[in-house]
Amino acid sequence: MKYSIIVPVFNRPDEVDELLECLTHQSEKDFEVVIVEDGSQTPCEEVCKRYEHMMDIHYYYKENSGPGQSRNYGAERAKGEYLLILDSDVVLPEGYLKAVSDELSREPADAFGGPDKAHSSFTDTQKAISYSMTSFFTTGGIRGGKKKMDKFYPRSFNMGIRRDVYLRLNGFSNMRFGEDIDFSIRIFKAGCRCRLFPEAWVWHKRRTDFRKFWRQVYNSGIARINLYKKYPESLKLVHLLPMVFTMGVIGTLLLLFFGFLPYMLGTVHVFPTLGNAMAALGCIGLAGIILYTIALFIDSSRENHSVKIGLLSIRAAFTQLMGYGCGFLSAWWKRCVLGQSEFSAYNKTFYK
């Protein structure tokens, strides 16, 4: 068997149904599906049973241990030459498996990954979040874009790897967030050939509201410091940009407030030079933020053919950059300054 598609799932039977439905339309048929139920209260076993006559599908239920360990559980039971790791909230185009096969035939790889896109049926908020998570303006192209500021690391929403390599590297670590980047780093360190398959893309639903999106990106910022503590060389300039943006926005607001406060209080004559300098610097920072916002709006509106999504993309981008930046700064203080151990946030409310 060529492919084993491994999907960890937690309380997402509807998403699993949609994913399995799209798998019935794949032109390539040499695959099995391994669904690992990670302690769900709303299981998808009945959904899986409906597809047993359409594909080779295996359903396993286990106690909750997180997505990384659930993928390992599935990999230990998989039979395919290649393991395809997917999130439950992705949908595959009909030619997905063929695109993977074509790339492997053209240039073999030990591990690989593909980009993600927003489906036309997604909500405007999902499309805005998808834009923010894939745009060069917000990610530096490190998530599979054509322009990039760092090499491509496969992500667990759309990732493939030879089964023998997966087992040799012991799969995913027990990190709660950032476990896919941790695995990709170890893949590179082992000297494996790792590639981006640009045509093996998926539709990725992502978070459905900005509150959940904040929790996700806040933990991503924490995970980057956790990864830095394990692999200091993995921290690149592009990973610092959200933190710089966050501090820049906060700094601009403070400069504007304290720069114009003397004018509002009628005390500008006390420290005129300092007040004017702070106000001027604040205005320069504000101008930069406005220009960046306009660029986001124009680019997203053009890409999504929607002014509304363009406006929502501004909120999504600021949520992503400042959420990541705040998580990054929090983890830097706790781990690098205070010397605390690895941690994550919103553990009890992450999915709510």
Model regions and ranges:
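A conserved acidic beta->alpha catalytic loop
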Residues: 22, 37-46, 64-65, 87-93
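Acidic donor-binding/catalytic loop of UDP-sugar-dependent glycosyltransferases
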Residues: 42-43, 90-103, 185
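Glycine-rich, basic loop-to-helix element that forms the pyrophosphate-binding segment
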Residues: 62-78, 99, 153-156
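Short aromatic/hydrophobic "clamp" motif used to bind/position activated sugar donors
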Residues: 83
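Conserved donor NDP-sugar-binding/catalytic core segment of glycosyltransferases
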Residues: 94-127, 205
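Catalytic donor/gating beta->alpha subdomain of glycosyltransferases that bind UDP-sugars
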Residues: 173-235
